[in-house]
């Protein structure tokens, strides 16, 4: 059993098949904490959830700057899972073929900043910013 403590102070119980999916739901809903019940109950902060999902690299969700480093294959795949996007849905969202999404998810080439940024905004992990 899992529960989220949301930013408005409310508590929401969620159904998830495992801890990984509960953590993804916590990110999707921008929860402050994820409560994990069971034999050894615990609470995870939003930062701990990002760390566990390997989405905690400094600068990963920042606006573009010279020297920006493209996401790793693992970061890209995890973002697709958090956003609940298939390759075809992600491709339609950002205007590329699903084959291109699959190639990036398979480690062929680097994900362009614009694609990464659109997907992070869609997932709710970054805000649209003005230059």
Regions found by a protein language model. Give the residues of each.
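N-terminal flexible/basic segments that precede or flank functional cores
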Residues: 1-69
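DNA major-groove recognition helix of helix-turn-helix
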Residues: 94, 104-105, 115, 123
């Amino acid at each position: 059993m899992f529960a989220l403590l949301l930013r408005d102070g409310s508590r929401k119980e969620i159904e998830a098949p495992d801890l990984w999916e509960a953590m993804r739901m916590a990110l999707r809903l921008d929860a402050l904490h994820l409560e994990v019940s069971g034999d050894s109950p615990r609470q995870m902060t939003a930062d701990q959830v990002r760390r566990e999902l390997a989405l905690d690299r400094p600068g990963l969700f920042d606006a573009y700057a010279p020297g920006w480093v493209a996401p790793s294959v693992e970061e890209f795949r995890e973002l697709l899972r958090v956003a609940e996007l298939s390759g075809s849905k992600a491709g339609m969202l950002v205007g590329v073929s699903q084959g291109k999404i699959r190639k990036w998810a398979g480690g062929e080439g680097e994900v362009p900043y614009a694609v990464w940024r659109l997907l992070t905004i869609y997932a709710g992990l970054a805000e649209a910013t003005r230059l």
